[in-house]
Swiss-Prot record:
Heterodimer of AddA and AddB. ATP binds at residues 8-15. The gene is addB. The heterodimer acts as both an ATP-dependent DNA helicase and an ATP-dependent, dual-direction single-stranded exonuclease. Recognizes the chi site generating a DNA molecule suitable for the initiation of homologous recombination. The AddB subunit has 5' -> 3' nuclease activity but not helicase activity. [4Fe-4S] cluster binds at residues 784, 1102, 1105, 1111. This is ATP-dependent helicase/deoxyribonuclease subunit B. Residues 1140-1159 are annotated as: Disordered. It comes from Caldanaerobacter subterraneus subsp. tengcongensis (strain DSM 15242 / JCM 11007 / NBRC 100824 / MB4) (Thermoanaerobacter tengcongensis). It is an enzyme of class 3 (hydrolase). One of its GO terms (molecular function) is double-stranded DNA binding. The keyword Transferase does not apply.
Amino acid sequence: MSIRFIYGRAGSGKTYFCLEEIKHKLNDGANHPLILLVPEQFTFEAEKYLLDMIERDEKMRAQVLSFKTLANRVFVEVGGLARQHMKACGKSMVIYKVLEENKEKLKVYSKASRQQGFVKKISEAITEFKRFDVTPFQLIDASEKIEKLGLKEKLEDLALIYSSFEEVLHKNYIDEEDELDLLSKKLEKSLQFEGAEFWIDGFTGFTPKQYKVIEKLLKKASRVSVTLTLDPSIDSIDPTHLFYTTKKTEEKLIKICETNGISVEEPVNLNKGIPKRFEHNKELAFLEKNFFSHPYEIYNEETKNISIFKATNMYSEVEEVARDIARLIRDEHMRYSDIVVATKDLKRYYKLVKAIFSHYGIPHFIDLKINITNNPIIVYVISIFEIYLKNWSYESVFRYLKTGFTGIDKEEINLLENYVLANGIKGNKWKERWEYRIDYKTDSLLMEEREKQIINKVNEVRERVYLPLEKFYTRFSHSKNVKEACEVLYDFLVENKLPEKIEKFIEEFKNRGEFDTANQYAQIWDIVVDVLDQMVEVLGEEKISLEQFARLISIGFDEYQIASIPPALDEVLVTSVDRMKSHNSKVLYLLGANDGVFPASSFEEGIFSDEERNLLSSLDLELDRDTKAKVFEEQFLVYTALTSASEFLKISYPIADHEGRSLRPSIIISRLRRIFPKIKVSTNIVEMDTDEENLNRVTVPLPTFNEMIKSFKKWNITGKIHPIWLEVYKWYRTKDEWKKKLEDTLEGFVYDNQIKRIPPLKIKKLYGEEMEFSVSRLEKYAACPFAYFVQYGLKAKERKIYGFEPPDLGIFMHNVLNEIAKALEKEELTWQEIDKEWCNDAVDIIVEEMVDKIPGYILKSSSRYRYLANRLKRVLSKAVWIISEHMKRSSFVPLGHEVAFGENQKYPPIKIVLSNGEEIKLIGRIDRVDVLEKEGETYVRIIDYKSGDKTLDLSDVLYGLELQLLVYLDAILESAFEGKANLSPAGIFYFKIDDPIVRADKDISDEELYKEIMKRLRLEGFVLKSLDIIREMDKLIEGTSYVIPASINKDGTIGKNTKGLTEEQFEILRKFVKKKSKKLAEEMLQGDISILPYKKEKETACQYCPYSSICKFETNFKGNDYRRIESKEEKLWSIFEEEVKEDGSQVDGRTEGSDNNEG
């Protein structure tokens, strides 16, 4: 019985020495067991090395074991497997059960027990206690010695949780940590390792339980050899030293030997000369010797085997690695298996490496286990419970449906989703048949056949979603315990053919070459069943609610991770520096060498803070290292990484993260640059157009093709290109498989997103043959022809979301005001005769009736919307009262409300004859027309209600953006209504429907408040510049009017603040608007669909346009620019007058004729 230490710095050949010794022992005929004991994650690699060195028939005598496989061997021999092994999933479930049962007794963790991730935190704490041989009794004992209340109560809580967990666990099970306890006991009875020889390799340190097992092995074995990464020539080692941990490991093993009378042999020191790994590479040998030396030497020669790459971001960093790997394979004749790519943060790099390496055709294995919680199969199972717990919320239902496992196809899901979103369906509404209207013809009260068909289809899909789930919830509610609940869920999954659907997906993935995804799906069903089995085993007879079940199954799934397909013979290994253990890699790419990342500068403290750990340590309660010690141990990780390759070390770091935030280089970079002043540092921050740089970008066909296109784009802008890309182009042109892609891509250089015209015959089919247009449609065309085409030609619609949006608000308010006008007529009242009380009562009744008569109407769907309905009542009451006040001060009287002009309406449409002889009709609906009879003349004013701020700007009229009021005026003036021939314009106005908030620094009187409200809600637009008409519109005017945008000076003249037009100006604008309408209609019907949005100061047509993703409008793109709107009034009038003068057309009745001289 003896122990022997094998010392050696990194690369000195410690593993090789062990394997060589085993080989020689076998050759010498050794008949006792020869065991290489390594960490669990390195067993596969160690077995491979061993097999390469020995004959296969000798494998039985020489074996590679980990502590886990060693335990299994002993248990098979002497027993110990009577109790079942509890998996991490079952362990978490027991902890959840313990927390639930003891939540009233817990002091610190009574509320935290239900927090996300808390079960995992407690699980890690219990694991730590067991690994370091800490019992619940020791926790209680420590708590009694501590005065600090927070830590005292924390220890008491943890002791209670831990002891309760152990009680449940040890009834029928053991967990992974118990195995080592059991192993150390059972080793005494084991005979298979009597006289065996052990080589323990690859460990930096051991847990207290592993030390106990080693102690037993030392008593059984003839010799135990332990490799230590250590330099025995270093005398004093403090906690900050690189080899501190391994030195402490040696001391503990020596102490065990002294206690048990086991001899310590003369150590083997491999630290002689150049380390074996670097015997042909003096740069890496120099690095190993000096990187952590104080003082260090400087390497003054050219550095060829170590390099640094400074990348703009993570993507370009990984792409540079991919390019360099392609070069090594092509030019240096390396094998992929010679290369390792490592990083401290593999989760952050995983997707990038996977995508870019696949793009470059680099075979690779990513040594990372992936959480399964986002896998569609798991999402499907979890969503079954979420739907119930979240009351059939939109998110939970469609998360479930979009997994692809419900048997409902995508088209049906889209139909259902649009309907649910448009109508805000959730909760009990899923139980009922749906009859909510679909917005085809909103003015039709009768449901059309097409609408009925869609609603029937929606309800058929609804039943296929609702009925199976409702049946499941009913059956689940009758289950008496966890076992029965698991059976109900399993039956539901099988009845809905989940295993068969998974198999179908696996086949599809394999056919597409997505073997990694196929491998993941293949494991998931077994995991689902395993979690259910664990629940039955651990909590089978426990009563459980659906909410608890959902939480438990989620906790179970959280414990599972899926590994990728095991590596092939020739693949690049992509791994984390924490798991890196490759003795035969020639090249290491070390990614993400950023400050604070590698080496890490901080760690999470866990259940105990560093201060608490140190306090417990002073009470002889030894736990894992504190974060400070872990930071020092990062040095050893850096050392291991930097010395793992035998030929090339390539370190890289990005200067910015994916959000553009700057990142600093790691201390590793600065230290390398000091030790190797001539080290090559390359970057892609500024692309160099050198022969070498361009040649490096030529790698494998697909990425090289993309690089060529990038060069062509620059050529297109700068007129310069490196000759190499012309040669590359010739290569692709000669390859049949690349010809089509090359042609299609080059066509993109002359791509223009502008589609100028569509043939008139096609455009008519798209817009409709009736040639009838509302004025608002012309205005939309003027704002941007392409947006108009998408909306009215392609009939594109935004998905309707259940809500009360500005358009809904506007329609609702208009309808209420129209109903008010009807109520006045019915009660034979005028606007002048009503008071505030009548306004409030009438609005209240009308709003309630409108809300009640529409099934599922949004304004009664929730307390929030009922509050909005009440607010609307206040706003509309104020609007009705203000209109009444306007009327009381005015001589004008309403001619009509909601006055329609068009075919079969009271007033005919405005007909415009186009240049080609075709006729279009302008139609519309005027909110209110007021008239005044005066001295044989009838004056007309047009009023349009608006729910938001709206001004009438003549520049908008010039560009066709504001035609409505003038066309409405023209419709009435040209109608010769009721035989009246002498019709004149009095004004065109917008009226804002609002209930303004008046803020004042001091108390104000009712009169002042009234005036302020009237001022804010006066009409906005243009009035006839006539003193008589202004006084008829506001009979009480003194100075500035509270009704219209006008003022009268003290001398009785019209004030300069009046927004007025003369009769001649009204006539000019009417003629201009007709001409503009004709021009817009002609452009529209000739198929002009140019992408030409307007811009007026900061406002553009694109601001709220839903079609920007279709047109791709960008001002820096060829042919893309705004139509800019001038707003100087003096200029505008000269343009209006010029346009009207050029137009020699005559107005005949209501028809606008054509003229060949029109510009």
